[in-house]
Amino acid sequence: MILATFIALFFSLSAYTDIQGREDQPLSVPHLKKSVMEAKNVPALLDAEDVPFTTIGCVNWSAYPYKPEAQFRIAHADSLIFIHYRVSEECVAALATDGGAVFKDACCEFFIMPADDGIYYNFETNCIGSLLLEEGIGKGALRSAAPKQVLSLVRRWASLGTQTFSLRQEPTTWELTLIIPVEAFFHHQLTSLSGRTMRANFYKCGNGLCQRHYLSWQPIRTPNPDFHQSAYFGTLMYQP
């Protein structure tokens, strides 16, 4: 009995240590030699610069075990952030438009804290490029939505097009890109990303899909699904 307890404790601590190790590993964000202005050209740009994909693969809550294939890659050009998502899942939907409940659709999210003031931004984008962007310290009433003119600054491309559609219960692979200028951080006065270190997390979700799921890049230790947990953000290091 004692031996069995010891073995169980050993493997539990090993798993915890592995998670802790992944949390403590900063992600280097390469500084690109070239840039593009159209979001549809981001995949080719990142291919040319050999920017690797990183998996969004943490299943944090046992009540939601479904794990679609989800990856992201990120780079910057001093005043621009380039993000490329690649997803394969069993069903998709895209009912929300800009400023709407995109998290109920097939959705990828980028939460980032650009300074040490506790304020973070949530860039939530569904599979047709509809964007929800807010800033604040907590969630709900503590957050402020971005004005429409700020949303328009974030250039987007989606492989599934831009037209809304209802639930499709069929295996689907889709891609999404964003070009985020520093002006999109509308509560801050950023001019350059080079050399900066920021806290962030990436998510894949689908609250209204046939297989509800909540994946993250960095693990989250809360009893219930909650992406607004900046204490569990990982580290992004923007290369000079």
Predicted segments with their positions:
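Bacterial Sec-dependent N-terminal signal peptides
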Residues: 1-24
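Structural preference for beta-rich elements and adjacent junctions enriched in aromatics
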Residues: 16-240
